[in-house]
Amino acid sequence: DMSCHVSEEERNKWNTNVYCNIYYGNNESVREIATACPFDPSAVIIFPTGVTPHVWDAPNSKDYIYTAYGSTFGTTNGLRFRDDRKTLKVYQNLKGIMNEVVCLNESGVAYCYVCIR
């Protein structure tokens, strides 16, 4: 039988499976968000606080998207994992394949991101 002793700090890191934080949009077309996540996330969810996840602008036939999902297997339009997976690259006013416009850095909007181990 082999015992392994770990510190309380190590145990807490192992038990941490979710990391949440917030960033505020500044309307830059491309922005990198350093998450300070204590682990390498395998998935991330970004959503706006106090804003509808997507807004349909009927007169202009545009769908404004304020949410994104990403994993080590791929991401939705407007979100990229940097090589370290702790830095998120988000886009503002990025055109999609139809009439959607990705808005992950809208000025004044608070975005919550959830990193999952």
Identify the residue ranges that each predicted region occupies.
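Short, surface-exposed beta-strand/strand-loop-strand elements in extracellular ectodomains
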Residues: 51-72
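Aromatic sugar-binding interfaces of carbohydrate-active proteins
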Residues: 41-43
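Short, exposed beta-strand/loop patches in secreted or surface proteins that constitute
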Residues: 71-92
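Fibrous stalk/shaft segments of extracellular and virion attachment machinery
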Residues: 1-19
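Short, structured beta-strand segments at or near domain termini in extracellular proteins/domains
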Residues: 99-117
